[in-house]
Amino acid sequence: MAKKILLVDDSASIRQVAGIALRRAGYETVEAANGKEALGLLDGNKLNLIISDVNMPIMNGIEFLKAVKQHPTSKFTPVVMLTTEAGDDLKAQGKAAGAKAWIVKPFQPQTLLDAVSKLILP
């Protein structure tokens, strides 16, 4: 059975590029355009990993990450954060909230796949 990844980003093009790379690597993907939409997908999916943008409307990635870590079915699910900002303060917030990896946009699909393979056990 393929490992399932929730991909959360307000950019349809980022979701498309990342989704294609992940599916080609054998992962199943579920997608959401913002944190609030993604929260609605936590109960119905057994997720192995979550990849979330930081800067999104409605609910940003840090707020979403905090909610994920409080959610009974996903609190132990590793989360990779995507952002255009590489500042230490933002990284510290993400790490404190439970992020396991941080990828700066724009990124090469292989960079994402490398991070995913380190966090998902075969």
Identify what each model region corresponds to.
Residues F107-V116:
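C-terminal output helix
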Residues G40, I62-K75:
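Short amphipathic alpha-helix used as the core "switch/output" element in two-component signaling
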Residues D53, T83:
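Active-site residues of response regulator receiver
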Residues N45-I51:
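Active-site beta3 strand of CheY-like receiver
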Residues A33-E37, N60-K66, A86:
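Acidic catalytic/metal-coordinating carboxylates
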